């Protein structure tokens, strides 16, 4: 079958999760790269633990927390692990920057070309809808994305099969008509 929709992961694929390093370096000199890497690693670890700890639930994980909350918890863990001060003002600056991560420079042109081909475009993300909406708007991509899909309604993170099933619930097409794009190998594998 022909591809009818191109669905992108958000964090790490459309939005550079490591762009937070610049602000982190300003706030914590010499620690920006460590903060960016550890923060992202812990964020992903939390999503996996939550989904894997309750794999047979029919109504999502009882341990589910919105991605924004996990992002904040991951930052707190990271700062504690690196023995850095968790001063509220600095934490809020980092969190606000995370809500407006730098998009990769080629995104807009690529999305415009996909739209010009008549294909449906979407994001499927662990991110909460408000996080995704902020990031998409900040990046100027709201006119080139047809759908922004969050896993929040099912209370399971990617790589649960149910999370990828949200695409067909939102866009009435067959799974083999979807091209899923992610910079994360675990995510691409989960979508297969």
Region locations from a protein language model:
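Active-site neighborhood of HAD-like aspartate-dependent phosphohydrolases
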Residues: 1-44
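Alpha-helical elements of Rossmann-like donor-binding domains used by nucleotide-donor carbohydrate transfer enzymes
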Residues: 22-23, 38, 73-77, 93, ...
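A metal-dependent, Asp-based hydrolase signature
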Residues: 33, 41, 45-93
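Short alpha-helical
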Residues: 34, 102, 130-131, 186-187
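Short, acidic loop-to-helix structural element flanking the phosphoryl-transfer center
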Residues: 64, 68-72, 84-123, 133, ...
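Substrate-recognition "cap/lid" segment bordering the active-site pocket of phosphatases
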Residues: 108, 122, 128-179, 189
């Amino acid at each position: 079958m022909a591809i009818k929709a191109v669905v992108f992961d958000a964090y790490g694929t459309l939005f550079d999760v490591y762009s937070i390093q610049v602000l982190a370096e300003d706030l914590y000199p010499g620690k920006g790269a460590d903060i960016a890497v550890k923060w992202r690693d812990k964020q992903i670890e939390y999503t996996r633990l939550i989904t894997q700890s309750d794999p047979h639930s029919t109504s999502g994980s009882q341990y589910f927390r919105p991605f924004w909350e996990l992002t904040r918890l991951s930052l707190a863990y990271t700062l504690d692990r690196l023995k850095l001060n968790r001063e509220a003002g600095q934490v809020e600056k980092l969190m606000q920057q995370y809500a407006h991560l730098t998009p990769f420079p080629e995104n807009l042109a690529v999305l415009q070309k996909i739209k010009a081909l008549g294909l449906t475009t979407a994001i499927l993300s662990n991110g909460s809808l408000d996080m995704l909406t902020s990031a998409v708007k900040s990046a100027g991509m709201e006119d080139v994305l047809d759908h922004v899909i969050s896993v929040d309604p099912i209370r399971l993170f990617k790589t649960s099969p149910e999370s990828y099933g949200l695409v067909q619930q939102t866009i009435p097409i067959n799974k083999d008509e979807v091209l899923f794009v992610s910079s994360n190998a675990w995510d691409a594998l989960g979508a297969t």
